[in-house]
Every structure is written in structure tokens, then in C-alpha cells.
Amino acid sequence: REMSNVVLSLDGRREVNDHMRPTVNGKGSYDVIVPKFQQLVSQRGTKDYYVRGTFTRENLDFADDVEHLASLGFRHVSVEPASGPLDDPFAIKEGDLPAVEAEYEKLARQLQGRKDVNFFHFNVDLAQGPCVIKRLRGCGAGCEYVAITPDGDIYPCHQFVGREEYRMGNVRSGDFDMDISGKFAELNIYTREDCRNCWARFYCSGGCSASNLLVNGDIKKPNAVACEMERKRLECAIALRAIAAGMGETENTECNNTDCSLCGSCAE
């Protein structure tokens, strides 16, 4: 009630969700949580929310999960790729990229022109976008916000919890390691060498530091698989914006030109 934004975890279709999110008694959680999520969303009014799922190597057909979530009445939807070290059986690998990229293209075609679904990764503000510091640094973990455990321990974000080398302090003892915070504050698309010449750098902002650490053992080294997926999502987002703006569209016209300054017939 007090939060301006909430994130609701649901992986999509019943069989997909229940495989990854069983309850403590081993049964599926789908039938338990879906009605509650629907009730919460119906009471949100104008407050923001997202239904967020995770797709793994076991459901690379995640476009169907987005469609399923939309069919449940959820307008704001996000599905994120599972990330992890090379031996993680669920994490998306380099060999999965052709299937994942094809699925993003399929999803873009399905969502073209639709107003009932707001897919997070295709919702890109190409005209304005985030502020400059966000474009350069991204989420701000460790320097703009932190995660605090029930014991009061402070970490750069929730994904670093349990990694003692990234424990920044404790709210009860009052200590705080500014050196760790400084390391995160220095991260940006220019200090991350792999990001400097990437065309997507001002929208990706260097990716997720926790994912970088998990995959490469270095918060400064981007996860190459995640980078490829981000570029594909942005490509789809740009295409959808271009189509919505009528750029290059010649359907139902006799004109083959994409430059409307060549003639004035379209304005007649």
C-alpha cells in the first residue's frame, strides 16, 4: 500500500512457474499466488507494478510466458534471463543466444501495435532516456543505494549478500566501508573497457555488477552473453518505435519512398 512500485515474481505459464517456484511442501505456487497478484494489481490504481519472471534454458520459448501473463490481466510485464556461472544448469549460455534472440524478435512481432502489454525491455525512451549519471553508471549499487540484511549487515545490493568481501558495514554498529562504496562509484561505461565502443552503452550503462562478478569474477568485466541479449532487446525496441512512428512503412500506399520530404501527396 505504501510502495509507489511493486515487483511481483511469477515466471509465466503454470508448468514453467511451478517447476522453478515450488512451495515448501513441494507443490506448485502458481494457483496460490496468481489470484493474490491479480487482487493486488486491481487495487493499485495508478501506482506502478511489474510482474517479473525469469526464463532459463528450460523455457527458451519465453514469449509464450509473456503472452500468458498478459492473458491474466497483467499489463506491465518483464521476463529476465537467468544468469550464473558456466556450470549453472539454468543460466543462459552462449550457445543459447540464437534461440533467445529469435524469441525476442518473435515477441516484438507479437507486441507490435498492442497497448495491453508494456514489456519492460522494449519500453525504451529514445528521445530523452535516463539522466546522464544513470546512462554512465547504471543502477548505482553500493553508492546510490544498498541492501540491508535482517542482521543489519550492509551490502552493495541484494545479490552481494553473503559475500564477505563485499560486506560494507552494519547499521547496528554504525560502521560503513567507503572504500567498497568508492569502487562501485567509479564504475561506468568508460572505466569498463569492454563497454567503451559498444553502441548500446548509454542504454545498458555497463550491465549488472553482480552478474559480472558471478560470471567473470570481476565487477568491471561485463557478462558477454548478457551484453548480446541487451543489444538484441534494444534492437527490437528501436524497431518497434520506428514502426510505430511509420518509418519505412509502405503498407496500403502506392508510395515506395521513406523520405516524406520528396513529395506532398501523403498530406493531401
Identify the meaning behind each predicted range.
Residues 1-82:
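Radical SAM/AdoMet-radical enzyme domain recognition
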Residues 7-9, 50, 78, 138, ...:
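Structured core elements
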Residues 14-18, 86-89, 207:
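Short acidic/His/Gly/Ser-rich catalytic and metal-binding motifs that mark active-site loops
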Residues 17, 119, 139, 168-171, ...:
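Short clusters of hydrophobic/aromatic residues that line enzyme substrate/ligand-binding pockets
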Residues 21, 158, 208:
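Short, flexible helix/strand-to-coil boundary loops that buttress conserved ligand/catalytic motifs
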Residues 87-163, 203, 254-255, 259-264, ...:
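A C-terminal junction/extension of Radical SAM enzymes
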Residues 161-268:
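Flexible mid-to-C-terminal extensions adjoining Fe-S/redox cofactors in radical SAM and related proteins
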